[in-house]
Every structure is written in structure tokens, then in C-alpha cells.
Amino acid sequence: MHLRHFFAFLALVLCHHTHAGNPWKLSLTDPKEKVTLTIDLHEESIEVPEMEMFGPMNGYLGGNIYGVWAVTSFKIKKDKAILRLSNDLGSETQEAELTQTSDSTYTLKLLGSTVVKRAEGRKLHKITSTLKMIRNQD
């Protein structure tokens, strides 16, 4: 009987440790730019707003930007993830590098020419190419 309790406790601890040490399943916000990034790079588990018909995906970039940008592919390299984002029309893509800088902060750097934009008045303007992201509380 005690052995069964031990293994149940061990499974619970390992499960918690896996989620606590998982830097690639999270929700981030840049409070200054009001941009959010929600990702799960371990499985396609996130419903992307306005793209529900495609089923769960690995994540999206949204908030104070024009449209929603879905994570269409990614590569994890040590402490960085290279994300490929596609807009909700499928007409533009943006590569971005996500780097963990501390337990609760990340930097999202848009690579190449920035195509992610925000509407200001009647015009579209490119967002800043480097976003300081803070991990949202689960």
C-alpha cells in the first residue's frame, strides 16, 4: 500500500517539475506595446482566435497589432526558439527569435524586415522589432 502512494507522489512531482521547467509553454505580454505571445512548442494545444477552423496550433501573436499571427513552424536551439509566424490571411510571414532572459522575462526579436504592423488612425505602422515580454501568471 505504501509503495503505491510513493509512486503516485513521485508521478505528481515529476509532472509538476516538467511543467515548471518548461520554458516553451507560456503566455507573454509586452506591456508597453500591448502585444501578447501565447505558445506551446511541445504540442499543438492552443486555439488561435479567428483561426479555430484549423484546430489547435502551437501558438499565436496578438494584441495591439493588425490581425492575428499564428505560429506555423519553429525550431528550438538551447535557450532560444525561432518562430515562423503567418498572418491570418496567409499572405505574410515573419520570423522571430524568442530568448529567455530570466525566469519571467523573454525577448522577442523580429528577424529581417518587420512585417507585423499595428493600425494607428487610418494607417498601418510597423511595430518595434524587439519586444520585452513578461511571463503572464498561469
Predicted regions located by residue number:
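Bacterial Sec-dependent N-terminal signal peptides
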Residues: 1-24
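Central antiparallel beta-sheet cores of small beta-barrel/beta-sandwich binding domains
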Residues: 21-101, 109-138
